[in-house]
From Swiss-Prot:
A cellular-component GO term for this protein: pilus
Assembly, per entry: Self-associates. Forms filaments. Interacts with EcpD.
Biological role stated in the UniProt entry: Part of the ecpRABCDE operon, which encodes the E.coli common pilus (ECP). ECP is found in both commensal and pathogenic strains and plays a dual role in early-stage biofilm development and host cell recognition. Major subunit of the fimbria.
Transcription regulation keyword on record: no
Primary localization class, coarse: other
Span of the signal peptide: 1-22
Top-level taxon of origin: Bacteria
Name of one Pfam family that matches: MatB
Species of origin: Escherichia coli (strain SMS-3-5 / SECEC)
Location of the protein in the cell: Fimbrium
Family to which this protein belongs: Belongs to the EcpA/MatB fimbrillin family.
Protein name: Common pilus major fimbrillin subunit EcpA
Length: 195
């Protein structure tokens, strides 16, 4: 009898030990978004991005996807104006990896097939020369009316170059380090009302 109790006790100890060693594994992460809100309906020119950009690496093409980035433009009309011009220029476009590698990606910006560069202005509207802005044409029609006019259009954003460490350029994006890159892409808009 003592042997049976001892054997049952040992089986229970071994069984209990096995259960104690099998533990659930859980993981938790917290995502935090920075948030701001802004309303400006009085400035002569207001440009508002409509969304954010997210580039994903695709192994099949060894590259990143491109993105359409929409924006809203609002202008205050000037009843004395005889012409209107709207231009854009790239200000910042570098994303930096969020680790110690220093890897960078440069974002290219196109407007209707024309590159938006840091070195010069891209003409979006120029009523004096017959450039009426495509999707932005309501601005070309409303610049000389004494109220606000809005229109929406978009840029095409794509990854155009990168580095593995901030200096060594890559020609094959598959050689980039794994990770996440972050930064700002900023485009300056200039509007001119000619009287």
């Amino acid at each position: 009898m003592k042997k049976k109790v001892l054997a049952i006790a040992l089986v229970t100890v071994f069984t209990g030990t096995g259960v104690a060693q099998a533990a659930d594994v859980t993981a938790q992460a917290v995502a935090t978004w920075s948030a701001t809100a802004k309303k400006d309906t009085t400035s002569k020119l207001v440009v508002t991005p409509l969304g954010s950009l997210a580039f994903q690496y695709a192994e099949g093409i060894k590259g990143f996807n491109s993105q359409k980035g929409l924006f809203d433009v609002a202008i205050e009309g000037d009843s004395t104006a005889t012409a209107f011009k709207l231009t854009s220029r790239l200000i910042t476009n570098t994303l930096t990896q969020l680790d110690t590698s220093g890897s960078t990606l440069n974002v290219g910006v196109d407007y209707n097939g024309a590159a938006v560069e840091k070195t010069g202005d891209t003409v979006m509207i120029d009523t004096a020369n017959g450039v009426l802005g495509g999707n932005l044409s309501p601005l070309a029609n409303g610049y000389n009316v004494s109220n606000r006019t809005t229109a929406q259009d978009g840029f095409t954003f794509s990854i155009i170059s990168g580095t593995t460490n901030g200096t060594t350029a890559v020609t094959d994006y598959s050689t980039l380090p794994e990770g996440i890159w972050s930064g700002d892409v900023s485009v300056q808009f200039d509007a001119t009302w000619t009287s």
